[in-house]
A protein has these predicted regions:
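N-terminal catalytic scaffold of extracellular/periplasmic and nuclease hydrolases
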Residues: 118-231, 238, 249-250, 255-258
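A short C-terminal boundary segment appended to hydrolase-like catalytic domains
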Residues: 122-134, 140-144, 154, 161, ...
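Active-site-proximal beta-strand elements of phosphoester/diester hydrolases
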Residues: 146-152, 289-297, 338-340, 434-438
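Binuclear metal-dependent hydrolase catalytic cores centered on His/Asp/Glu-rich metal-binding motifs
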Residues: 160-162, 166-170, 203, 284-339, ...
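Short acidic, glycine-rich surface-loop motifs adjacent to enzyme active sites
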Residues: 179-191, 220-225, 299, 325-350
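Active-site-proximal segments of metal-dependent phosphoesterases and phosphodiesterases across multiple
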Residues: 193-213, 332-369
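Active-site-adjacent helix-turn-beta-strand microarchitecture at beta-sheet edges
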Residues: 219-292, 371-374, 379-380, 384-401, ...
Length: 550
């Protein structure tokens, strides 16, 4: 039966009736029979059947002269059974009359609703204290996605001189390979027909970055200040590798995605208005739609910037960039909009200026970006979870509107905080994420660790962050499986600090900066590295997560 009763009488819809028999102590008397597990409703029972059951139970108790329990209870509170009383018989008829009166009133309030309602066993948790919602057939399907965000993949001489690139990633491939999407910024050009080059103009052969792909990384940013280190030739060779990798993995269980270069423009070689557009990657992971854009606000040289997503860090250009991003999302329905931004901030500086923070706020609120993944400083900065303070209120409003629109009930308008929301197109998010810099994932910058001074600024370049985040998506549908709205919630964010360790063979490899690795070093007799990384671990853990509400 579908209900349209007002909220203030909702508690009357949640019944708990007694059955006669022996209680838990073996004494003859009344005890509770729960008609629902936690929610106040069973998956198959209807309100009128509960009323009839209650009538029958009460009649049995009265006829058998058994003690009667309180028939109605407020959700979440249990009323203790009334003990037998000598004067009970004087009141049994009154109890029966009261039950009949309230039962008739509840059934009357239900109106001429259908008798076919069967409530799904998967009901939204926000409905738990609003019993009238349980009479609705609105249900949801929930799914999850796990994302891993790394930092910069650098290629100094110490890195590309190694004979086996695979061992670089052995220490973290269990993390990067298990996430649905693992993100990294490739801060070098890729060219198989040229020799590898280190700072200041980076170039690497594809076998170096292919090992990162094999380690599980499958989403790459190609837009940074080194993208045009080798001019248009370097841009083209990098684009060719990216396209080849994307094509080769397209039908694999783990396809690889790229953003940052304007591949169509690079292939055609034509200078036209397309150079003003943003290139992006738009793909699906199971039932999740992802929109990914990589852009840079800084270049080491001005030439050929039209072949990449380059946005100058001026107020005017930033406004236009935010507008472009907003329009891009409006034309591409997605569950998560992720922006990789190579910032124009100074390197090796931990503080983020207020102007940059203000730009991040614009990207989240006006450009409709969900996740900002920034890099360039080569050190780890704090990251921020931005909570939507109106989320619960708006979620309740959407659910109320959905039920009202589906069942025609006149729900109290005070809970409908957003009456203008188009329920069928609504996507409500509880949190957004700002990563200001995840440091170096691999580099040769800390080639001379200061074991006696681990707080040295240069030593920060040898440590990085893998931030693992899990999102939940709930798609709410009506009884005809028509989508009403959906929610996106950030369920968890787990940091894993990493370090570039130089082993006895002068190989630069990534290790987890944790107690296990430090203990391993101690057991092997490498006390110098053990003590150094113990100090580095304490330093890195000061760089953590903070939460703000807006």
């Amino acid at each position: 039966m579908e209900f349209g009763i007002s909220r203030k009488f909702a508690f009357l819809v949640q019944f708990r009736f007694l059955n006669c028999g022996k209680d838990s102590r073996g004494a003859e008397g009344g005890h509770w029979t729960e008609r629902s597990e936690g929610s106040g409703w069973s998956s198959s029972g209807t309100p009128d059947s509960l009323v009839l059951t209650g009538l029958k139970n009460l009649q049995n108790c009265v006829s058998q002269d058994k003690p009667v329990c309180t028939l109605f209870s407020v959700p979440g509170k249990r009323t203790k059974p009334v003990k037998s009383h000598p004067k009970y018989k004087k009141f049994k008829n009154w109890h029966l009359t009261a039950l009949i009166f309230f039962s008739a009133w509840v059934l009357f309030s239900a109106g001429c609703a259908s008798q076919k309602n069967v409530v799904s066993s998967t009901q939204p948790e926000v409905f738990a204290n609003n019993a009238e919602f349980y009479a609705s057939t609105v249900t949801f399907k929930e799914s999850f996605i796990n994302l891993c965000f790394a930092g910069d993949i650098m290629a100094h001489k110490q890195n590309f001189s190694m004979s086996d690139y695979s061992i670089i990633w052995d220490g973290i491939r269990d993390i990067t390979g298990s996430a649905d999407l693992s993100f990294a910024n490739i801060e070098t050009t890729v060219d198989d027909f040229k020799e590898c080059m280190s700072y200041p103009q980076f170039r690497i052969n594809s076998d170096y970055v292919n090992e990162a792909v094999k380690a599980g990384f499958n989403v790459f940013s190609l837009a940074n200040n080194h993208t045009n280190d080798w001019g248009l030739e370097g841009i083209k060779s990098t684009a060719e590798w990216a396209q080849k990798t994307a094509d080769a993995t397209e039908k694999s269980p783990r396809p690889v995605h790229f953003s940052g270069l304007k591949l169509d423009l690079i292939e055609s070689g034509k200078m036209n208005n397309s150079g003003k557009d943003i290139s992006f990657s738009y793909f699906e992971v199971r039932d999740w739609k992802i929109l990914f854009v990589a852009a840079t606000e800084i270049l080491n040289r001005p030439e050929f910037s039209q072949y990449m997503n380059f946005s100058k860090p001026t107020k005017k250009v930033r406004r236009l960039f935010a507008e472009q991003l907003r329009n891009l999302r409006a034309s591409h329905e997605c569950d998560l909009f992720i922006l990789s931004l190579h910032t124009a901030e100074p390197e090796y500086v931990f503080k983020t200026e207020m102007e940059q923070e203000s730009f991040y706020k614009t990207l989240l609120n006006e450009a409709c970006v969900d996740i900002i993944w920034a890099n360039h400083p080569h050190v780890v900065k704090p990251w921020t979870v931005v909570k939507n303070s109106a989320y619960r209120e708006n979620l309740l409003a959407l659910k109320t509107k959905a039920i009202s629109g589906t069942h025609g009930s006149n729900v109290d308008e005070t809970v409908n905080a957003d009456a203008t929301v188009n329920v069928a197109e609504s996507v409500l998010s509880d949190s957004k994420l700002i990563m200001r810099a995840n440091g170096n994932t691999i580099s040769g910058q800390r080639w001379d660790p200061k074991f006696n001074a681990p707080e040295t600024l240069r030593d920060y370049t040898g440590d990085g962050l893998l931030l693992n985040v899990t999102f939940s998506k709930k798609v709410y549908t009506d009884s005809k499986h028509k989508k009403l709205f959906q929610t996106i919630e950030l369920k968890s964010s787990q940091p894993c600090y990493i370090t570039t360790y130089i082993n006895s063979k002068w190989q630069f490899v990534i290790k987890k900066l944790d107690e296990n690795f430090i203990s391993e070093l101690k057991k092997s007799g490498n006390k110098v590295w053990a003590e150094y990384l113990k100090s580095r671990k304490k330093i890195m853990e000061k760089t953590g997560e903070n939460t703000i509400w807006q």
